[in-house]
Amino acid sequence: MTTETFEFQVEARQLLQLMIHSVYSNKDVFLRELVSNASDALDKLRLAALRDDAPDADVSDLHIELEVDKDARTLTVRDNGIGMSYDEVTRLIGTIANSGTAKFLEELREAKDAAGADGLIGQFGVGFYSGFMVADEVTLVTRHAGETEGTRWTSRGEGTYTLERIGEAPQGTAVTLHLKPADVENQLHDYTSAWKIKEIVKRYSDFITWPVRLLPEPGGDGSDGEGAEAREAETLNSMKALWARPRDEVSDDEYHELYKHIAHDWRDPLETIRLQAEGTFEYQALLFVPSHAPHDLFTQGYQRGVQLYVKRVFIMDDCEELLPPHLRFVKGVVDAQDLSLNVSREILQQDRHIRMIQRRLTKKVLSTVKDLRTSAPDRYATFWREFGAVLKEGLVTDSDNRDAILAACSFASTHDAEEPTALKDYVERMKEGQDDIYYMTGESRQAIENSPHMEAFRAKGVEVLLLTDAVDEVWVDAVGEYEGKTLRSVAKGEIDLSGTEADKSDAEKEKQGEEYAGLLGWMTEHLGEEVKEVRLSSRLTVSPACVVSDAGELTPALENMYRAMGQEVPGAKRILELNPEHQLVKSLNRAWTDRQDRAELTETAELLHALAVLAEGGRPKEPARFVQLMADRLERTL
């Protein structure tokens, strides 16, 4: 049949060059990736057969074969799984249809250490290309189960590949690597060595559900010269499901390799969680909390969910129903005993057993994270840095587990510049007479600490939570209170700190209010298009003015967030607060009292408001006018 030549997609060509000219020390990972791909193909075929989606497929002896030819220096990884059609080969191998491709290439180029570079291969799902680390040429022969025609794909990794339809091909996929010469100095081992292949499979793929068989060499003994008699194919892996084995029989290394296989990650997990339920509904769960957040964790297309098995039969790779969205970073396996093998996503969404598993897994993960804070503070700090923002989403969406989520959370605060605090600890440190838990949201810790809204709290030593994640704007309103203490923004509504420390008497406040009443009314009138009200502030000690929102209104940051989501948000007028102890405000009040019709007073009021807006990170409504007024004032000082 006709052989056609095609060019690789640009990203695929760049990736190939990185693989071909690889300097990564651990080139053994190529076999892990190819065996993992073969295992996935077998899983898909068995599931299709169970659902009668592949009536003509042969599922009598599903397995993976490894075959070496020392003379030809080839290694073949073969499976009799689902296989691929001609179109699938073109789509899946000729191009890289992955939204993270550019990110992958960038990280691959920047990875300095060998382990980091090797592991990125699996992380981004392009393991097939890893074969070019050890081979000058790669040939793939495949036939989709139930079809009569096969496909041959060949490339030397030089920017092009050939495709050919073939009449004779066994069911499944065979990848033949034409190996480069061994080069021990560059960690390029002899991958025709049976001993080396056994070592790699045992290390990376021992838990694979399907038998991985090493075939004897053609015409040889298949044992690297250990005997003259031909032998049967040797099964290299134990095929034991780790979650079904007693805990004391499974090593940390075995758990870590399973995690890497499931998550396509190269780093060890942060925490391993095992769970077993017996009785009327039995299941086993083996979950992993990663040590780092994937680059696409907050994108809409992020593939969340854990693997679902039924009686050790693989059902699906990303069962979203087993964990809520705010735990989408958790990876692992759930093996249920009493579900139907023909289960569908629609059934899963309504199945009470699945809901029961989700509740149990959620509570277990949350309690594990909470315990990490005291048992392993360093690991907890890593968890919170990587996944804290995701977990806090549950404070909005998961009211049933809100208390457990809060118990697992920690927040930056003014109490300690390095260590975040739990709400429980904040409450224990509250000043006598303090009734509220104070917080402020902002883009960064530095921006919040420099905000005028923080001045009185700093002066009186009142602790404030410093919240810098986008979700913080939402969850504080959803939660509302903790242990009877109201969560109160220092930038919204009126703040009364008089109970925490000696302050002005009511008589003094009343006198001051009368002294400034005229100025406040006049400024409210002249700034009416910009502000709802001008009033004296109890939160300022250094700055002349600040702008605040009413207690029930959206913050500017939250308004911007909703607008970015395409929602219309009516702009709310803010409140301008003046510091009656600041010299500028005192001078403005005297000037207004002496002569209320001076044009400069209106300009000063505008400038004061604009400066307050700038101080909180906003921008004046008319930047050009603000610049003009400032320039005029500066000119008068010279």
Curated annotation (Swiss-Prot):
Annotated GO CC locations: cytosol
Family matches, as SUPFAM superfamilies: ATPase domain of HSP90 chaperone/DNA topoisomerase II/histidine kinase (SSF55874), HSP90 C-terminal domain (SSF110942), Ribosomal protein S5 domain 2-like (SSF54211)
UniProt cross-references to InterPro entries, sorted A to Z: HATPase_C_sf (IPR036890), Heat_shock_protein_90_CS (IPR019805), HSP90_C (IPR037196), Hsp90_fam (IPR001404), Hsp90_N (IPR020575), Ribosomal_Su5_D2-typ_SF (IPR020568)
A Pfam family the protein falls into: HATPase_c_3
Region annotation C: where it falls in the sequence: 561-638
Chief location of this protein within or outside the cell: cytoplasm
Region (A) location: 1-345
Subcellular localization, as worded in the UniProt entry: Cytoplasm
GO molecular function terms attached to this record: ATP binding; ATP hydrolysis activity; ATP-dependent protein folding chaperone; unfolded protein binding
Superkingdom assignment: Bacteria
Listed GO biological process terms: DNA damage response; protein folding; response to heat
B: region residues: 346-560
Keywords per UniProt: ATP-binding, Chaperone, Cytoplasm, Nucleotide-binding, Stress response
HAMAP family assigned: HSP90
Complexes and interactors: Homodimer.
Family the UniProt entry places it in: Belongs to the heat shock protein 90 family.
Protein purpose: Molecular chaperone. Has ATPase activity.
Name of this protein: Chaperone protein HtpG
Lineage: Bacteria, Bacillati, Actinomycetota, Actinomycetes, Kitasatosporales
Originating gene: htpG
